[in-house]
Each structure stands twice: as C-alpha cells, then as structure tokens.
Amino acid sequence: MKMGLAALIALLAGAAAAGEPCREMRHEGLRHVVCEARAGDDLRLFLNAPDGTPFGSFGRIDAALAAEGAALEFAMNAGMYHADRRPVGLYVEAGEEAARLVTSAGPGNFGMLPNGVFCIGQDGFAVIESRRFAEDRPACRHATQSGPMLLVAGEVHPRFIPGSTSRYLRNGVGVSPDGGTAYFVISRGRVNFDGFARFFRDALGVRDALYLDGNISRLHAPGLGRSDAGLPMGPVVGLVAPR
C-alpha cells in the first residue's frame, strides 16, 4: 500500500503524540492544557505521605513514587481543601474513605449545588452529581468531591452566567460518555465558569464535568516542560508510570 508523504507525516506525528498524555488546545480564543487518562491506566489520588503529613507538592509525590520505581506522567490539584489540607468533601484513596460526602448547599464554589464526585473505578471513570452519588454509590478505588459541577448530562450549570466578568485560572475534570477517558483540563489564562464548561462540552465532547479549583490551580506535566510551584496543596490526582 502506498502512502503519501503528508499522510505518513501525520501518522508519525499522531504516534509520537500518543505517548504524551498532555497537549494544548484552543477554544474560542482561549488556550487550555488537556491531559488524558484511559481506563486501565494507573491513575491515583494522593493526599498524605507515608509519614502522615500532607504531600503538598508534586515533588514530594514523585520522590515517594521513585521508591517503587515509578513517576508522575502528569498531576494536578484535585479538589478543595481546608487550611490544614484536609479535603472539604468526600475523599477516597486506594479504597479507604478519609473524608465524608457532603450533600448540603453551602458557601463558596464547593457549595454551589449541584456539585459532584470524580470516581476512579475498576473499569473506568465517572463524574456524578453528589446527591445522585449518595443514592446509588458506585465502587470507587479513588474518589474526590468538589464543586460546582460544570456539566450535568451535557447541560451547563444553571447558575453560570454567559459573558461573566468573574474570570480566573481554573482546572477541572470531565469524562467521556463511555467512561473510558478522563480529561483533566487547566486553563492557560483567565476564563469564566460558562466558558470553561463549554470547553469540556464543545471541544472535548464531554457530558459530565466537575470543577476542581481556581486561583491555586497547578499542573505537573514533564512532557510539556511544566511543573507549577506554589503553596502546599491538598488532594492531588496523578497518572503514574514506570520510570
């Protein structure tokens, strides 16, 4: 079979990109970094180090993984937390629940219902509205609660305002309709909630997505030459691979 040069270049470029989980995408004039995990990947949540203190940084997590011959392919902050880095809502790590589910409305973004839970299951991923999660709780190897939901069944959160001037750096997670792919997104600039939600729906084809946080949002993506520093973090989600 003959293949044109342009087609061959495209094929090789796609093969090269397949090994890098993170890429930059543009939507409505704004840039976002998108990192993907697939069902079967070693995607984990991290909170406390073996000594019981919060990891707080990508570097400490990577150092702990080195002891098992592994490293972070990418990572980002994964939900809201108190001043001592305890999760605000549900937190499950390696099957152990460290913080309970919160289903009541409350102050701030977390309490802007509907909020939701990101679940890493045995066979894939899910983003589920918190009260629905409470009614029919799936088996989650890892789970983190945050808020607000960005998308519920393809619909933008009802309290988001198109054209809002409340623009911040933001990060979130969405799941493909078949549950086989999780998309972790961080904006490269300031974006409002409505625009961020529509990126998941219109650029990634996601129907359910969850906001993770705003100004403190950080990304570790060695393949992009990026590892953001800052104040100590609470929960972190990361894709783990052999060194």
Q: Can you annotate each of these PLM segments?
A:
Residues M1-L8:
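Sec-dependent signal peptide recognition
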Residues A13-A15:
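N-terminal signal peptide c-region/cleavage motif recognized by signal peptidases
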Residues A17-N109:
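Zymogen propeptides
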Residues R26, D84, L212-H220:
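Small/polar glycine-rich anion-binding or flexible loop at a beta-alpha turn
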Residues A37-D41, C119-G124, V152-G154, V175-G180, ...:
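Short acidic-glycine loop/turn motifs at beta-strand connectors
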Residues P50-T53, R132-D136, I186-R190:
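Short, solvent-exposed aromatic-acidic interface loops
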Residues R86-F160:
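Active-site-adjacent helix-turn-beta-strand microarchitecture at beta-sheet edges
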Residues V88-S104, R159-R170, V175-D208, S217-R243:
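Conserved, well-ordered active-site substructure
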